[in-house]
Design a protein with these regions (language model features):
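Active-site neighborhoods of divalent-metal-dependent phosphate/nucleic-acid chemistry enzymes
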Residues: 93-132
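Short acidic-hydrophobic, aromatic-tinged amphipathic segments that line or gate anion-handling sites
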Residues: 91-95, 149-151
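Short active-site oxyanion
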Residues: 50-53, 89-91, 130-132
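Acidic, PIN/NYN-like endoribonuclease modules and their adjacent C-terminal/linker elements
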Residues: 1-10, 123, 129-151
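Short, well-structured N-terminal submotif of metal-dependent ribonuclease cores
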Residues: 1-56, 69-79
């Protein structure tokens, strides 16, 4: 399976934020993108692609677990929660008041785009952490000026 669509646009270590849609594709065995996302994560684990560090946030974990409970099984949802929270490879970012306020500003600025609160929170967090690449199967991040992986 080719993963060239996942290669970073820069050389060297590239921080990557993990969106709900990317994690859903990885954890749900019947997701359309499951095999390519699994192959991509295998390359991260072996170090053959330079994405590091990996980030996600509590809003993504909430969305992911809720989605997996309804679209997969409670046991898959629990496995995803446990693997993300216990992972030494993924930094779980907890939200704060300043990010929450910044999301309010972003919602107002992009009010005609229908971008979700969670996606705005991801973008605000990514900018704060100087992360440009996001693993997502969601076009909203391009609207927000971020680099979506896979391309």
């Amino acid at each position: 399976m080719t993963t060239t669509r996942f290669e970073p646009l820069q050389d060297g270590p590239t921080p990557l934020f993990l969106d709900t849609s990317g994690l859903f594709a990885y954890f749900h065995p019947r997701a359309d993108e499951h095999e390519e996302t699994k192959a991509f994560f295998d390359r991260i684990v072996t170090g053959s692609t330079p994405y590091r560090p990996l980030y996600t946030n509590t809003y993504v974990v909430d969305e992911l677990v809720t989605l997996l409970q309804s679209k997969a099984t409670p046991s898959i949802a629990w496995e995803a929660f446990e693997r993300i929270v216990e992972s030494g490879a993924i930094e779980l970012v907890y939200e704060n008041e300043s990010r929450f306020d910044a999301v309010g500003d972003a919602l107002e600025r992009y009010d005609d785009h229908g971008i979700s609160f969670t996606d705005h929170m991801i973008a605000v967090t990514m900018r704060e952490l100087n992360v440009d690449h996001v693993l997502a199967y969601d076009g909203d991040f391009e609207t927000l000026g971020l680099t979506v992986v896979p391309r």
